[in-house]
């Protein structure tokens, strides 16, 4: 992920 919002992931 990009470091925004909730939840798992990169």
Swiss-Prot record:
Documented EC number(s): 3.2.1.14
Main subcellular location: secreted
A cellular component term, taken from the record's GO annotations: extracellular region
Keyword annotations: Antimicrobial, Carbohydrate metabolism, Chitin degradation, Fungicide, Glycosidase, Hydrolase, Polysaccharide degradation, Secreted
First-tier enzyme category under EC: hydrolase
Coiled-coil features, chain-numbered ranges: none
Thermal behaviour (record text): Optimum temperature is 50 degrees Celsius. Retains only 60% and 25% activity after incubation at 30 degrees Celsius and 60 degrees Celsius for 1 hour, respectively.
Location in the cell: Secreted
GO biological process, alphabetically ordered: chitin catabolic process; defense response to fungus; killing of cells of another organism; polysaccharide catabolic process
Documented activity regulation: Inhibited by Hg(2+) and, to a lesser extent, by Ag(+). Hardly or not at all affected by Fe(3+), Mg(2+), Co(2+), Zn(2+), Ca(2+), K(+), EDTA, beta-mercaptoethanol and N-acetylglucosamine.
Comment on pH dependence: Optimum pH is 5 at 37 degrees Celsius. Retains >80% activity after incubation at pH 3-10 for 1 hour.
GO MF annotation, one: endochitinase activity
Record bears the keyword Secreted: yes
Reactions it catalyzes: Random endo-hydrolysis of N-acetyl-beta-D-glucosaminide (1->4)-beta-linkages in chitin and chitodextrins
Physiological role: Has antifungal activity. Inhibits mycelial growth of wood rotting fungi P.chrysosporium MTCC 787, S.commune ITCC 3751, G.trabeum MTCC 355, P.agaricans ITCC 761, C.versicolor MTCC 138, P.versicolor ITCC 13, P.placenta MTCC 144 and P.friabilis ITCC 335.
Protein name per its UniProtKB record: Chitinase
Source organism (scientific name): Streptomyces violaceusniger
